Amino acid sequence: MPSLSKEAALVHEALVARGLETPLRPPVNELDNETRKRLIAGHMTEIMQLLNLDLSDDSLMETPQRIAKMYVDEIFSGLDYANFPKITVIENKMNVDEMVTVRDITLTSTCEHHFVTIDGKATVAYIPKDTVIGLSKINRIVQFFAQRPQVQERLTQQILTALQTLLGTNNVAVSIDAVHYCVKARGVRDATSATTTTSLGGLFKSSQNTRQEFLRAVRHHN
């Protein structure tokens, strides 16, 4: 793996140790992003031609390049730990020992089974120990792991593990409520169902009162 920030390396190692890392094959020859985009565009051209689409049409001729750029620079950018957000943690000088909750974190991800959209919101909470984290960093961590081919259960646990690792405490909880377009737009075509996943650590798992306080925050969001 290329040179990474200390925080990115720690999070990656923690996910591997827990068996929660996104399935990735070892790179045989590390490609730069421009090469990736060029090769993806070539394969996308072949796919579109197999669908009998006319790539000489001005509406379609740039589509392979647009998709390649979207994959590498946007919706799958979380596969590259070089894009892991810069994390700021500060000493807990105020001795905060109550739950800190961030609700309504918007996320858009991609189902790894069909490569269609997952659209949802996350609620994240933690009880500080020695450090506290800049609130926007929680949103950025959620977004980083969402920018991958995902299953919602793994995404929830990846966010939990990342925050536990960075904050040095197990007292973290994550809940995600999302609509899966592999259910909404194909297959059963259920336009109204949503999926909720929750991952609890430390006191959020062992203390009924703490768990209920978090779940009330989740219900408030819903």
From Swiss-Prot:
Keyword Signal: no
EC number: 3.5.4.16
GO terms assigned for molecular function: GTP binding; GTP cyclohydrolase I activity; zinc ion binding
Binding, Zn(2+): 111, 114, 182
Principal EC category: hydrolase
Disulfide bonds: none
Catalytic activity, reaction form: GTP + H2O = 7,8-dihydroneopterin 3'-triphosphate + formate + H(+)
Alphabetized UniProt keyword annotations: GTP-binding, Hydrolase, Metal-binding, Nucleotide-binding, One-carbon metabolism, Zinc
Entry protein name: GTP cyclohydrolase 1
Organism: Enterobacter sp. (strain 638)
